[in-house]
Amino acid sequence: MSIRAEEISALIKQQIENYESQIQVSDVGTVIQVGDGIARAHGLDNVMSGELVEFANGVMGMALNLEENNVGIVILGPYTGIKEGDEVRRTGRIMEVPVGEALIGRVVNPLGQPVDGLGPVETTETRPIESPAPGVMDRRSVHEPLQTGIKAIDALVPIGRGQRELIIGDRQTGKTSVAIDTIINQKDQNMICIYVAIGQKESTVRTVVETLRKHGALDYTIVVTASASQPAPLLFLAPYAGVAMGEYFMYKGQHVLVVYDDLSKQAAAYRELSLLLRRPPGREAYPGDIFYLHSRLLERAAKLSDAKGGGSLTALPFVETQAGDISAYIPTNVISITDGQIFLQSDLFFSGVRPAINAGLSVSRVGGAAQIKAMKKVAGTLRLDLAAYRELEAFAQFGSDLDKATQAKLARGARTVEVLKQDLHQPIPVEKQVLIIYALTRGFLDDIPVEDVRRFEKEFYLWLDQNGQHLLEHIRTTKDLPNEDDLNKAIEAFKKTFVVSQ
Protein backbone atom coordinates (compact mmCIF):
# COMPACT_ATOMS: atom_id res chain seq x y z
CA MET A 1 0.00 0.00 0.00
CA SER A 2 1.62 3.26 -1.16
CA ILE A 3 1.31 6.49 0.77
CA ARG A 4 0.15 9.33 -1.48
CA ALA A 5 1.53 12.67 -0.40
CA GLU A 6 -1.22 14.75 -2.04
CA GLU A 7 -3.93 12.85 -0.09
CA ILE A 8 -2.17 13.50 3.19
CA SER A 9 -1.64 17.17 2.40
CA ALA A 10 -5.33 17.49 1.37
CA LEU A 11 -6.42 15.96 4.69
CA ILE A 12 -4.11 18.26 6.66
CA LYS A 13 -5.41 21.30 4.71
CA GLN A 14 -9.02 20.23 5.43
CA GLN A 15 -8.30 19.87 9.13
CA ILE A 16 -6.60 23.26 9.27
CA GLU A 17 -9.58 24.89 7.50
CA ASN A 18 -12.11 23.26 9.85
CA TYR A 19 -10.15 24.05 13.01
CA GLU A 20 -12.15 26.10 15.50
CA SER A 21 -10.49 27.49 18.58
CA GLN A 22 -13.05 27.25 21.39
CA ILE A 23 -11.63 29.05 24.37
CA GLN A 24 -13.86 28.88 27.44
CA VAL A 25 -13.38 31.70 29.88
CA SER A 26 -14.80 31.22 33.36
CA ASP A 27 -14.34 33.19 36.54
CA VAL A 28 -12.97 30.94 39.24
CA GLY A 29 -12.42 31.85 42.87
CA THR A 30 -11.15 30.14 45.99
CA VAL A 31 -13.05 29.48 49.21
CA ILE A 32 -11.20 31.23 52.05
CA GLN A 33 -13.69 30.55 54.84
CA VAL A 34 -16.79 28.38 55.30
CA GLY A 35 -19.23 27.69 58.13
CA ASP A 36 -22.88 28.09 59.26
CA GLY A 37 -24.17 27.96 55.67
CA ILE A 38 -21.98 30.90 54.58
CA ALA A 39 -18.81 30.79 52.45
CA ARG A 40 -16.38 33.59 51.67
CA ALA A 41 -14.52 33.38 48.37
CA HIS A 42 -11.61 35.34 46.92
CA GLY A 43 -11.10 36.00 43.20
CA LEU A 44 -14.71 36.34 41.95
CA ASP A 45 -14.21 40.02 41.09
CA ASN A 46 -16.90 40.22 38.37
CA VAL A 47 -19.69 38.30 40.14
CA MET A 48 -23.17 39.93 40.19
CA SER A 49 -25.28 40.41 43.29
CA GLY A 50 -27.68 37.46 43.56
CA GLU A 51 -25.73 35.39 41.00
CA LEU A 52 -25.57 31.61 41.32
CA VAL A 53 -22.11 30.15 41.88
CA GLU A 54 -21.08 26.49 41.84
CA PHE A 55 -18.74 24.84 44.33
CA ALA A 56 -16.36 22.00 43.44
CA ASN A 57 -18.73 19.35 44.88
CA GLY A 58 -21.69 20.56 42.75
CA VAL A 59 -23.54 22.41 45.54
CA MET A 60 -24.89 25.80 44.42
CA GLY A 61 -24.52 29.08 46.26
CA MET A 62 -25.79 32.63 45.83
CA ALA A 63 -23.55 35.71 46.04
CA LEU A 64 -25.10 38.20 48.47
CA ASN A 65 -22.22 40.29 49.84
CA LEU A 66 -19.86 41.89 47.30
CA GLU A 67 -16.94 43.23 49.32
CA GLU A 68 -13.61 44.77 48.33
CA ASN A 69 -11.48 41.65 48.58
CA ASN A 70 -13.97 38.79 49.00
CA VAL A 71 -17.52 37.69 48.20
CA GLY A 72 -20.03 36.49 50.83
CA ILE A 73 -21.95 33.49 49.47
CA VAL A 74 -24.98 31.77 51.02
CA ILE A 75 -24.88 28.03 50.37
CA LEU A 76 -28.10 26.50 48.96
CA GLY A 77 -27.64 23.02 50.35
CA PRO A 78 -25.42 21.03 52.71
CA TYR A 79 -22.19 22.91 53.40
CA THR A 80 -20.29 20.10 55.15
CA GLY A 81 -18.63 18.96 51.89
CA ILE A 82 -17.15 22.40 51.15
CA LYS A 83 -13.73 23.22 52.59
CA GLU A 84 -11.21 26.04 52.60
CA GLY A 85 -9.20 26.18 49.36
CA ASP A 86 -12.00 24.63 47.23
CA GLU A 87 -12.70 26.05 43.80
CA VAL A 88 -15.90 28.08 43.25
CA ARG A 89 -16.97 29.27 39.81
CA ARG A 90 -19.46 31.77 38.41
CA THR A 91 -22.43 30.48 36.41
CA GLY A 92 -23.51 33.83 34.93
CA ARG A 93 -27.13 33.02 35.93
CA ILE A 94 -29.30 34.88 38.39
CA MET A 95 -31.31 32.64 40.75
CA GLU A 96 -34.34 31.27 38.85
CA VAL A 97 -37.04 28.63 39.33
CA PRO A 98 -38.93 26.37 36.92
CA VAL A 99 -42.46 27.60 36.14
CA GLY A 100 -45.44 26.30 34.18
CA GLU A 101 -48.52 24.09 34.25
CA ALA A 102 -46.43 21.00 35.12
CA LEU A 103 -45.93 22.32 38.67
CA ILE A 104 -49.66 22.25 39.48
CA GLY A 105 -50.47 19.47 41.93
CA ARG A 106 -46.82 19.09 42.95
CA VAL A 107 -44.86 19.72 46.15
CA VAL A 108 -41.50 21.38 45.41
CA ASN A 109 -38.67 23.03 47.33
CA PRO A 110 -37.68 26.71 46.74
CA LEU A 111 -35.32 25.63 43.94
CA GLY A 112 -38.25 24.01 42.11
CA GLN A 113 -37.03 20.45 42.78
CA PRO A 114 -39.87 17.99 43.57
CA VAL A 115 -40.02 16.61 47.10
CA ASP A 116 -43.23 14.55 46.71
CA GLY A 117 -41.62 11.45 45.18
CA LEU A 118 -43.66 11.71 41.95
CA GLY A 119 -40.71 12.04 39.58
CA PRO A 120 -39.22 15.12 37.88
CA VAL A 121 -41.25 18.22 36.98
CA GLU A 122 -41.64 18.21 33.18
CA THR A 123 -41.13 21.88 32.34
CA THR A 124 -38.48 23.79 30.40
CA GLU A 125 -39.52 27.35 31.30
CA THR A 126 -37.93 29.31 34.15
CA ARG A 127 -38.37 32.74 35.73
CA PRO A 128 -35.91 34.74 37.86
CA ILE A 129 -37.05 34.80 41.48
CA GLU A 130 -36.38 38.55 41.72
CA SER A 131 -38.26 40.56 39.12
CA PRO A 132 -39.68 44.10 39.11
CA ALA A 133 -43.27 44.61 40.29
CA PRO A 134 -45.83 45.82 37.70
CA GLY A 135 -45.69 49.60 37.24
CA VAL A 136 -48.45 52.11 38.02
CA MET A 137 -49.83 52.15 34.46
CA ASP A 138 -49.81 48.34 34.21
CA ARG A 139 -52.22 48.00 37.13
CA ARG A 140 -55.93 48.39 37.64
CA SER A 141 -57.74 49.02 40.91
CA VAL A 142 -59.03 45.90 42.69
CA HIS A 143 -62.68 45.37 41.74
CA GLU A 144 -63.38 41.61 41.54
CA PRO A 145 -64.14 39.72 44.76
CA LEU A 146 -62.09 36.72 45.83
CA GLN A 147 -64.60 34.60 47.74
CA THR A 148 -62.99 32.89 50.71
CA GLY A 149 -66.14 30.98 51.67
CA ILE A 150 -65.68 32.26 55.24
CA LYS A 151 -68.66 34.39 56.29
CA ALA A 152 -66.72 36.60 58.72
CA ILE A 153 -64.20 37.53 56.02
CA ASP A 154 -66.51 37.88 53.00
CA ALA A 155 -68.92 40.06 55.01
CA LEU A 156 -66.59 42.13 57.24
CA VAL A 157 -63.13 42.23 55.62
CA PRO A 158 -63.66 41.31 51.95
CA ILE A 159 -60.66 40.37 49.82
CA GLY A 160 -60.42 41.29 46.13
CA ARG A 161 -58.38 39.74 43.33
CA GLY A 162 -55.00 41.48 43.31
CA GLN A 163 -55.18 42.56 46.95
CA ARG A 164 -52.62 41.89 49.71
CA GLU A 165 -54.38 40.97 52.94
CA LEU A 166 -52.28 40.19 55.99
CA ILE A 167 -53.43 37.40 58.31
CA ILE A 168 -51.96 38.08 61.72
CA GLY A 169 -52.29 36.39 65.09
CA ASP A 170 -50.58 34.31 67.75
CA ARG A 171 -49.60 30.71 67.11
CA GLN A 172 -52.51 28.24 67.18
CA THR A 173 -55.25 30.76 66.37
CA GLY A 174 -56.30 29.22 63.04
CA LYS A 175 -54.25 31.26 60.53
CA THR A 176 -53.39 28.27 58.32
CA SER A 177 -57.01 27.06 58.49
CA VAL A 178 -58.22 30.38 57.01
CA ALA A 179 -55.82 29.95 54.09
CA ILE A 180 -56.67 26.28 53.51
CA ASP A 181 -60.42 27.04 53.51
CA THR A 182 -59.83 29.89 51.05
CA ILE A 183 -57.88 27.56 48.73
CA ILE A 184 -60.60 24.87 48.98
CA ASN A 185 -63.23 27.50 48.09
CA GLN A 186 -61.43 28.38 44.83
CA LYS A 187 -62.65 25.13 43.23
CA ASP A 188 -64.34 25.92 39.87
CA GLN A 189 -63.35 29.61 40.26
CA ASN A 190 -60.60 29.44 37.58
CA MET A 191 -57.91 30.20 40.16
CA ILE A 192 -54.37 28.83 40.57
CA CYS A 193 -53.32 28.63 44.24
CA ILE A 194 -49.76 28.54 45.59
CA TYR A 195 -49.16 27.61 49.23
CA VAL A 196 -45.67 28.58 50.44
CA ALA A 197 -44.72 26.88 53.73
CA ILE A 198 -41.75 28.63 55.37
CA GLY A 199 -40.06 27.00 58.34
CA GLN A 200 -43.01 24.67 59.06
CA LYS A 201 -42.66 21.18 60.49
CA GLU A 202 -42.65 18.62 57.68
CA SER A 203 -45.51 16.76 59.39
CA THR A 204 -47.59 19.98 59.27
CA VAL A 205 -46.91 20.42 55.55
CA ARG A 206 -47.88 16.78 54.98
CA THR A 207 -51.20 17.36 56.80
CA VAL A 208 -51.91 20.46 54.66
CA VAL A 209 -51.15 18.56 51.43
CA GLU A 210 -53.42 15.67 52.47
CA THR A 211 -56.25 18.09 53.39
CA LEU A 212 -55.98 19.78 49.99
CA ARG A 213 -55.91 16.40 48.23
CA LYS A 214 -58.96 15.16 50.17
CA HIS A 215 -61.00 18.20 49.06
CA GLY A 216 -59.80 18.01 45.44
CA ALA A 217 -57.90 21.30 45.79
CA LEU A 218 -54.49 19.91 44.82
CA ASP A 219 -55.68 19.89 41.18
CA TYR A 220 -55.10 23.67 41.02
CA THR A 221 -52.50 24.15 43.77
CA ILE A 222 -48.69 24.25 43.90
CA VAL A 223 -47.07 23.68 47.31
CA VAL A 224 -43.62 25.23 47.87
CA THR A 225 -42.00 24.07 51.10
CA ALA A 226 -38.83 25.06 52.94
CA SER A 227 -39.21 23.12 56.17
CA ALA A 228 -37.66 23.95 59.54
CA SER A 229 -34.80 21.49 58.92
CA GLN A 230 -33.65 23.25 55.72
CA PRO A 231 -30.77 25.77 55.59
CA ALA A 232 -31.73 29.42 56.23
CA PRO A 233 -31.08 30.53 52.59
CA LEU A 234 -33.90 28.24 51.38
CA LEU A 235 -36.34 29.72 53.94
CA PHE A 236 -35.34 33.19 52.75
CA LEU A 237 -35.87 32.26 49.06
CA ALA A 238 -39.15 30.31 49.40
CA PRO A 239 -41.61 33.27 49.12
CA TYR A 240 -39.78 34.66 46.07
CA ALA A 241 -39.89 31.23 44.41
CA GLY A 242 -43.65 31.04 45.09
CA VAL A 243 -44.42 34.48 43.67
CA ALA A 244 -42.25 33.81 40.57
CA MET A 245 -44.30 30.66 39.86
CA GLY A 246 -47.48 32.73 40.31
CA GLU A 247 -46.34 35.57 38.04
CA TYR A 248 -46.02 33.13 35.14
CA PHE A 249 -49.80 32.54 35.31
CA MET A 250 -50.65 36.19 36.12
CA TYR A 251 -48.92 37.49 32.99
CA LYS A 252 -50.89 34.91 30.97
CA GLY A 253 -54.13 36.57 32.11
CA GLN A 254 -55.00 34.01 34.80
CA HIS A 255 -55.88 34.59 38.46
CA VAL A 256 -53.50 33.44 41.19
CA LEU A 257 -53.67 33.26 44.99
CA VAL A 258 -50.36 33.00 46.89
CA VAL A 259 -50.29 32.18 50.62
CA TYR A 260 -47.05 32.87 52.54
CA ASP A 261 -47.10 30.83 55.75
CA ASP A 262 -45.39 32.68 57.43
CA LEU A 263 -43.22 35.75 56.84
CA SER A 264 -42.02 35.98 60.47
CA LYS A 265 -39.93 32.86 59.86
CA GLN A 266 -38.59 34.28 56.60
CA ALA A 267 -37.57 37.46 58.45
CA ALA A 268 -35.80 35.36 61.12
CA ALA A 269 -33.95 33.37 58.41
CA TYR A 270 -32.90 36.61 56.69
CA ARG A 271 -31.73 38.04 60.01
CA GLU A 272 -29.61 34.91 60.52
CA LEU A 273 -28.03 35.25 57.06
CA SER A 274 -27.39 38.98 57.48
CA LEU A 275 -25.71 38.56 60.86
CA LEU A 276 -23.54 35.71 59.55
CA LEU A 277 -22.56 37.93 56.59
CA ARG A 278 -21.62 40.59 59.19
CA ARG A 279 -24.15 43.17 58.01
CA PRO A 280 -24.86 45.78 60.71
CA PRO A 281 -27.90 44.86 62.86
CA GLY A 282 -30.75 47.30 63.55
CA ARG A 283 -33.90 47.10 65.67
CA GLU A 284 -34.45 43.64 67.23
CA ALA A 285 -31.16 42.66 65.46
CA TYR A 286 -32.93 42.68 62.05
CA PRO A 287 -30.84 44.19 59.21
CA GLY A 288 -31.62 47.64 57.81
CA ASP A 289 -33.29 46.29 54.65
CA ILE A 290 -35.81 44.01 56.38
CA PHE A 291 -38.67 46.31 55.26
CA TYR A 292 -37.48 46.06 51.65
CA LEU A 293 -37.33 42.26 52.00
CA HIS A 294 -41.12 42.16 52.43
CA SER A 295 -42.15 45.20 50.38
CA ARG A 296 -40.47 43.98 47.19
CA LEU A 297 -42.18 40.61 47.66
CA LEU A 298 -45.70 41.94 48.34
CA GLU A 299 -45.56 44.69 45.68
CA ARG A 300 -45.49 41.91 43.08
CA ALA A 301 -49.15 41.16 43.90
CA ALA A 302 -51.34 43.12 41.50
CA LYS A 303 -54.48 43.30 39.42
CA LEU A 304 -53.17 43.89 35.90
CA SER A 305 -54.79 46.29 33.45
CA ASP A 306 -56.76 44.89 30.50
CA ALA A 307 -53.90 45.90 28.17
CA LYS A 308 -51.63 43.54 30.13
CA GLY A 309 -54.12 40.66 30.00
CA GLY A 310 -56.18 41.43 33.12
CA GLY A 311 -54.56 38.70 35.24
CA SER A 312 -54.23 39.04 39.00
CA LEU A 313 -52.03 37.83 41.84
CA THR A 314 -53.53 37.99 45.33
CA ALA A 315 -51.21 37.67 48.33
CA LEU A 316 -52.18 36.36 51.78
CA PRO A 317 -49.07 36.86 53.92
CA PHE A 318 -49.09 35.50 57.49
CA VAL A 319 -47.29 37.06 60.43
CA GLU A 320 -47.11 35.40 63.84
CA THR A 321 -47.39 37.70 66.86
CA GLN A 322 -46.11 37.12 70.38
CA ALA A 323 -48.89 37.46 73.00
CA GLY A 324 -51.08 39.45 70.60
CA ASP A 325 -48.55 42.29 70.18
CA ILE A 326 -49.32 43.70 66.73
CA SER A 327 -47.11 46.75 67.39
CA ALA A 328 -43.86 44.73 67.16
CA TYR A 329 -41.36 45.41 64.36
CA ILE A 330 -42.26 42.83 61.67
CA PRO A 331 -46.08 43.07 62.20
CA THR A 332 -46.07 46.90 61.85
CA ASN A 333 -43.82 46.66 58.77
CA VAL A 334 -46.11 44.20 57.00
CA ILE A 335 -49.31 46.01 58.10
CA SER A 336 -47.97 49.18 56.43
CA ILE A 337 -47.24 47.31 53.17
CA THR A 338 -50.52 45.38 52.84
CA ASP A 339 -54.06 46.52 51.93
CA GLY A 340 -55.55 45.49 55.25
CA GLN A 341 -55.25 42.81 57.89
CA ILE A 342 -57.31 40.05 59.47
CA PHE A 343 -56.44 39.85 63.16
CA LEU A 344 -57.05 36.47 64.80
CA GLN A 345 -57.25 36.61 68.58
CA SER A 346 -56.45 33.73 70.91
CA ASP A 347 -59.07 34.83 73.52
CA LEU A 348 -61.82 34.53 70.91
CA PHE A 349 -60.40 31.24 69.65
CA PHE A 350 -60.42 29.66 73.11
CA SER A 351 -63.93 30.98 73.86
CA GLY A 352 -65.22 28.99 70.86
CA VAL A 353 -65.54 31.83 68.32
CA ARG A 354 -63.93 30.25 65.26
CA PRO A 355 -62.67 31.70 62.93
CA ALA A 356 -61.37 33.93 65.77
CA ILE A 357 -61.53 37.20 63.81
CA ASN A 358 -61.40 40.41 65.83
CA ALA A 359 -63.79 42.63 63.84
CA GLY A 360 -62.55 45.82 65.50
CA LEU A 361 -58.88 45.47 64.58
CA SER A 362 -59.39 43.78 61.19
CA VAL A 363 -59.75 46.01 58.13
CA SER A 364 -59.79 45.72 54.36
CA ARG A 365 -58.55 48.85 52.61
CA VAL A 366 -60.29 47.73 49.43
CA GLY A 367 -63.61 47.18 51.20
CA GLY A 368 -66.85 47.34 49.24
CA ALA A 369 -65.03 47.30 45.89
CA ALA A 370 -64.32 43.62 46.59
CA GLN A 371 -67.92 42.65 47.39
CA ILE A 372 -70.86 41.73 45.21
CA LYS A 373 -73.83 44.14 45.36
CA ALA A 374 -75.98 41.73 47.37
CA MET A 375 -73.34 41.31 50.10
CA LYS A 376 -72.76 45.07 50.27
CA LYS A 377 -76.47 45.61 50.92
CA VAL A 378 -76.85 43.03 53.69
CA ALA A 379 -73.48 43.36 55.44
CA GLY A 380 -73.30 47.16 55.54
CA THR A 381 -74.15 47.55 59.23
CA LEU A 382 -72.68 44.25 60.42
CA ARG A 383 -69.30 45.63 61.54
CA LEU A 384 -70.93 48.50 63.50
CA ASP A 385 -73.41 46.10 65.12
CA LEU A 386 -70.56 43.84 66.23
CA ALA A 387 -68.46 46.72 67.57
CA ALA A 388 -71.47 48.08 69.51
CA TYR A 389 -72.18 44.59 70.88
CA ARG A 390 -68.60 44.12 72.12
CA GLU A 391 -68.79 47.51 73.87
CA LEU A 392 -72.18 46.82 75.48
CA GLU A 393 -71.10 43.31 76.45
CA ALA A 394 -68.41 44.80 78.68
CA PHE A 395 -71.03 46.97 80.47
CA ALA A 396 -73.57 44.16 80.71
CA GLN A 397 -71.12 42.10 82.76
CA PHE A 398 -71.74 44.45 85.70
CA GLY A 399 -75.30 43.14 85.79
CA SER A 400 -77.00 46.54 86.00
CA ASP A 401 -80.59 46.88 84.73
CA LEU A 402 -80.62 47.47 80.98
CA ASP A 403 -83.30 49.19 78.94
CA LYS A 404 -85.18 47.41 76.13
CA ALA A 405 -83.08 48.91 73.28
CA THR A 406 -79.80 47.81 74.90
CA GLN A 407 -81.18 44.31 75.53
CA ALA A 408 -82.23 44.10 71.87
CA LYS A 409 -78.72 45.14 70.75
CA LEU A 410 -77.14 42.54 73.02
CA ALA A 411 -79.51 39.85 71.73
CA ARG A 412 -78.77 40.77 68.08
CA GLY A 413 -75.01 40.84 68.81
CA ALA A 414 -75.04 37.37 70.36
CA ARG A 415 -76.84 36.00 67.28
CA THR A 416 -74.40 37.81 64.96
CA VAL A 417 -71.45 36.13 66.71
CA GLU A 418 -73.19 32.74 66.32
CA VAL A 419 -73.90 33.27 62.60
CA LEU A 420 -70.27 34.25 61.92
CA LYS A 421 -68.96 31.03 63.49
CA GLN A 422 -68.03 28.36 60.98
CA ASP A 423 -66.76 24.79 60.98
CA LEU A 424 -63.34 23.86 59.63
CA HIS A 425 -62.96 23.09 55.89
CA GLN A 426 -66.61 23.91 55.14
CA PRO A 427 -66.56 27.05 52.99
CA ILE A 428 -70.03 28.42 52.19
CA PRO A 429 -71.01 29.76 48.73
CA VAL A 430 -71.54 33.52 48.73
CA GLU A 431 -75.23 33.28 47.77
CA LYS A 432 -76.01 31.27 50.92
CA GLN A 433 -73.91 33.67 53.01
CA VAL A 434 -75.97 36.60 51.70
CA LEU A 435 -79.28 34.94 52.64
CA ILE A 436 -78.32 33.98 56.21
CA ILE A 437 -76.86 37.47 56.84
CA TYR A 438 -80.03 39.00 55.36
CA ALA A 439 -82.12 36.93 57.79
CA LEU A 440 -79.87 38.06 60.66
CA THR A 441 -79.76 41.80 59.90
CA ARG A 442 -83.49 42.02 59.13
CA GLY A 443 -84.36 40.57 62.54
CA PHE A 444 -85.63 37.12 61.51
CA LEU A 445 -83.32 35.42 64.03
CA ASP A 446 -84.22 37.67 66.98
CA ASP A 447 -86.81 35.19 68.31
CA ILE A 448 -84.60 32.11 67.74
CA PRO A 449 -82.71 31.05 70.91
CA VAL A 450 -78.95 31.69 70.64
CA GLU A 451 -78.10 27.99 71.08
CA ASP A 452 -80.35 27.13 68.08
CA VAL A 453 -78.85 29.66 65.65
CA ARG A 454 -76.19 27.30 64.21
CA ARG A 455 -78.79 24.56 63.69
CA PHE A 456 -81.18 27.11 62.13
CA GLU A 457 -78.44 28.09 59.68
CA LYS A 458 -77.63 24.48 58.66
CA GLU A 459 -81.30 23.56 58.17
CA PHE A 460 -81.93 26.83 56.29
CA TYR A 461 -79.21 25.92 53.76
CA LEU A 462 -80.76 22.46 53.24
CA TRP A 463 -84.21 24.05 52.83
CA LEU A 464 -82.81 26.53 50.27
CA ASP A 465 -81.28 23.67 48.25
CA GLN A 466 -84.74 22.15 47.90
CA ASN A 467 -87.13 25.13 47.91
CA GLY A 468 -85.05 28.26 47.31
CA GLN A 469 -82.99 27.45 44.23
CA HIS A 470 -84.51 30.42 42.34
CA LEU A 471 -83.27 32.83 45.05
CA LEU A 472 -79.75 31.34 45.02
CA GLU A 473 -79.66 31.40 41.22
CA HIS A 474 -80.74 35.06 41.17
CA ILE A 475 -77.84 36.09 43.45
CA ARG A 476 -75.38 33.90 41.51
CA THR A 477 -76.25 35.40 38.13
CA THR A 478 -77.16 39.04 38.89
CA LYS A 479 -74.91 39.47 41.99
CA ASP A 480 -77.81 41.46 43.46
CA LEU A 481 -80.52 40.77 46.05
CA PRO A 482 -83.80 39.23 44.85
CA ASN A 483 -87.10 41.01 45.55
CA GLU A 484 -87.24 41.59 49.34
CA ASP A 485 -90.87 40.42 49.57
CA ASP A 486 -89.89 37.07 48.02
CA LEU A 487 -86.98 36.80 50.45
CA ASN A 488 -89.12 37.60 53.47
CA LYS A 489 -91.78 35.08 52.39
CA ALA A 490 -89.13 32.36 51.89
CA ILE A 491 -87.55 32.96 55.32
CA GLU A 492 -90.98 33.02 57.01
CA ALA A 493 -91.93 29.78 55.23
CA PHE A 494 -88.76 28.11 56.55
CA LYS A 495 -89.27 29.47 60.07
CA LYS A 496 -92.66 27.75 60.22
CA THR A 497 -90.95 24.39 59.63
CA PHE A 498 -88.09 25.04 62.10
CA VAL A 499 -88.53 23.45 65.53
CA VAL A 500 -86.94 25.31 68.44
CA SER A 501 -85.19 22.98 70.92
CA GLN A 502 -86.83 22.81 74.34
Curated annotation (Swiss-Prot):
Q: Annotated Gene Ontology MF terms?
A: ADP binding; ATP binding; proton-transporting ATP synthase activity, rotational mechanism
How does the protein's chain sit in the membrane according to the entry? Peripheral membrane protein
Q: Give the matching Pfam families.
A: ATP-synt_ab, ATP-synt_ab_C, ATP-synt_ab_N
Q: What GO CC terms are in its UniProt record?
A: plasma membrane; proton-transporting ATP synthase complex
Locate the transmembrane regions by residue number: none
Q: Name the reaction it catalyses.
A: ATP + H2O + 4 H(+)(in) = ADP + phosphate + 5 H(+)(out)
Q: Where, subcellularly, is it found?
A: Cell membrane
Where this protein primarily resides, as one coarse class?
membrane
Which residues of this protein are annotated with the site description Required for activity?
A: S362
Region Disordered, annotated ranges: 115-137
Entry's PROSITE patterns?
Answer: ATPASE_ALPHA_BETA (PS00152)
Which positions does UniProt annotate for ATP binding?
G169, D170, R171, Q172, T173, G174, K175, T176
Keywords of the record, alphabetical order, are: ATP synthesis, ATP-binding, Cell membrane, CF(1), Hydrogen ion transport, Ion transport, Membrane, Nucleotide-binding, Translocase, Transport
Q: What is its EC number?
A: 7.1.2.2
Output the superkingdom of the source species: Bacteria
The record's listing under SUPFAM superfamilies reads: C-terminal domain of alpha and beta subunits of F1 ATP synthase (SSF47917), N-terminal domain of alpha and beta subunits of F1 ATP synthase (SSF50615), P-loop containing nucleoside triphosphate hydrolases (SSF52540)
**Could you tell me which cysteines form disulfide bridges?**
none
- Main EC class the enzyme belongs to: translocase
What does the UniProt record say this protein does? Answer: Produces ATP from ADP in the presence of a proton gradient across the membrane. The alpha chain is a regulatory subunit.
Per the record, the similarity remark reads:
Belongs to the ATPase alpha/beta chains family.
- Subunit and interaction comment: F-type ATPases have 2 components, CF(1) - the catalytic core - and CF(0) - the membrane proton channel. CF(1) has five subunits: alpha(3), beta(3), gamma(1), delta(1), epsilon(1). CF(0) has three main subunits: a(1), b(2) and c(9-12). The alpha and beta chains form an alternating ring which encloses part of the gamma chain. CF(1) is attached to CF(0) by a central stalk formed by the gamma and epsilon chains, while a peripheral stalk is formed by the delta and b chains.
Q: What is this protein called?
A: ATP synthase subunit alpha
The record lists the organism as: Geobacillus kaustophilus (strain HTA426)
